[in-house]
């Protein structure tokens, strides 16, 4: 790693998606600033990824803007906003405060990240948000993810309009249910609501996919990396659907 390399900033860097994204962007030759709440988790990630810049910050707090900005010492090629939100249950039972928290993390967090990096963005820089399938295809059992990811898409569209004149593009990546520990928590919550076994819920989730699969963190990282191509300018304001054939609606 050299100091001349452009940076990628990854929020949620120690999660399943985040670690795969960090690996992919580091392999692409970018210096990576990894943002997460846990300093211990960041230290473990730094041991695995040589040259990683660890930045302990809570993206749900406005204080993160100054903390992240202080970690940036050169041009930023890409920012990736991928924090997780809590499993709040279905729309009939989810605490309203949990929904507000989810929007604060997803939308408020994205805006904090953008503001932290703004002075380092240049023509060709990418703003990337990791949303989710439930923002487009709602379910009664994932209220926080559905509401927050729908709002996130709107925010990405607004950012694409605001940053377009500067040659900076904004993108949403929307994975379907992914093979992660968080999915197991979602399945357990849904199983409790329906009074069935967790394995039955997971089987139902697989059946929703036209290819009978969950999305993987590696596939999400691949989608992030392809946005580095100059041709991806044409995709600003759009969503990359990585739902393994789950979406039924048009367009």
Question: What kind of feature is each model-predicted range?
Answer:
Residues 126-165, 176-178:
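Catalytic loop of short-chain dehydrogenase/reductase
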Residues 232, 236-251:
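Short C-terminal tail/terminal secondary-structure segment
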Residues 85, 92-112, 128, 145, ...:
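Catalytic Tyr-X3-Lys loop
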Residues 48-63:
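Rossmann-fold cofactor-recognition segment
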Residues 14-15:
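Conserved glycine-rich cofactor-binding loop
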Residues 164, 169, 235-237:
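Short, small/polar-rich loop/turn modules that mediate ligand/substrate recognition or access, typified
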Residues 70-74, 105-125, 160-161, 229:
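Amphipathic alpha-helical dimer-interface segment in Rossmann-like NAD(P)H-dependent oxidoreductases
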Residues 82-88, 245:
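Conserved NAD(P)H cofactor-binding loop of Rossmann-fold oxidoreductase domains
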């Amino acid at each position: 790693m050299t100091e001349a390399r452009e940076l990628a900033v990854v929020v949620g860097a120690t999660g399943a998606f985040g670690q795969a994204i960090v690996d992919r962007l580091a392999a692409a030759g970018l210096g990576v600033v990894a943002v997460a709440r846990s300093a211990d988790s960041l230290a473990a990630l730094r041991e695995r990824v040589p040259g990683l810049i660890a930045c302990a910050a809570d993206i749900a707090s406005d204080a993160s803007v100054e903390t992240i900005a202080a970690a940036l010492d050169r041009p930023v090629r890409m920012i990736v906003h991928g924090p997780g939100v809590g499993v709040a249950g279905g729309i009939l039972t989810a605490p309203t405060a949990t929904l507000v928290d989810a929007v604060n993390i997803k939308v408020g967090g994205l805006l904090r990240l953008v503001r932290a990096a703004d002075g380092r963005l240049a023509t060709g820089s990418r703003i990337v948000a990791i949303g989710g399938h439930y923002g487009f295809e709602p379910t009664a059992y994932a209220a926080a993810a559905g509401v927050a990811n729908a709002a996130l898409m709107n925010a990405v569209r607004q950012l694409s309009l605001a940053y377009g004149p500067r040659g900076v593009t904004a993108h949403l990546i929307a994975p379907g249910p992914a093979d992660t520990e968080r999915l197991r928590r979602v399945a357990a919550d849904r199983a409790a609501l329906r009074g069935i076994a967790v394995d039955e819920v997971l089987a139902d989730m697989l059946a929703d996919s036209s290819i009978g699969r969950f999305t993987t963190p590696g596939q999400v990282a691949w989608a992030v990396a392809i946005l580095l191509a100059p041709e991806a300018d044409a995709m600003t304001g759009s969503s990359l659907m990585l739902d393994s054939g789950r979406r039924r609606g048009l367009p």
